[in-house]
Amino acid sequence: MVMTDPIADFLTRIRNANQANHEVLEVPASNIKKGIAEILKREGFVKNVEIIEDDKQGIIRVFLKYGQNGEKVITGLKRISKPGLRVYKKREDLPKVLNGLGIAILSTSEGLLTDKEARQKNVGGEVIAYVW
């Protein structure tokens, strides 16, 4: 089966696992998925990320994070730039997700960054997704 948007599939798998209160999620690896998973870990949306190497492309294991009473840390994920409609923003036009409570993940010339990091480095890029 050919997948036209592996990033949207990755975000949907995270959203579905989160809604079902799963602890661990495994997805086929790619460099951009690894980058997105590392940003989610760095920003505190997931507990941990493991990269499992195999003889094929590898697997990313994402450990989802919940609050003490089981409340979800990730309340929303939204794919912004899609294969059919790419969305690019200049540095001065970078969005703030929920007035700074969420993050925007961008693909820039400096690599994958959050909106806050892109503002600090003074770069714009393709808006991959919003996470809040």
Curated annotation (Swiss-Prot):
Keywords: Ribonucleoprotein, Ribosomal protein, RNA-binding, rRNA-binding. Pfam families: Ribosomal_S8 (PF00410). Signal peptide: none annotated. It comes from the Bacteria. GO terms for biological process: translation. InterPro entries: Ribosomal_uS8, Ribosomal_uS8_CS, Ribosomal_uS8_sf. GO terms for molecular function: rRNA binding; structural constituent of ribosome. The keyword Ribonucleoprotein applies. GO terms for cellular component: ribonucleoprotein complex; ribosome. Part of the 30S ribosomal subunit. Contacts proteins S5 and S12. Belongs to the universal ribosomal protein uS8 family. One of the primary rRNA binding proteins, it binds directly to 16S rRNA central domain where it helps coordinate assembly of the platform of the 30S subunit. This is Small ribosomal subunit protein uS8. The lineage of its organism: Bacteria, Bacillati, Bacillota, Bacilli, Lactobacillales.
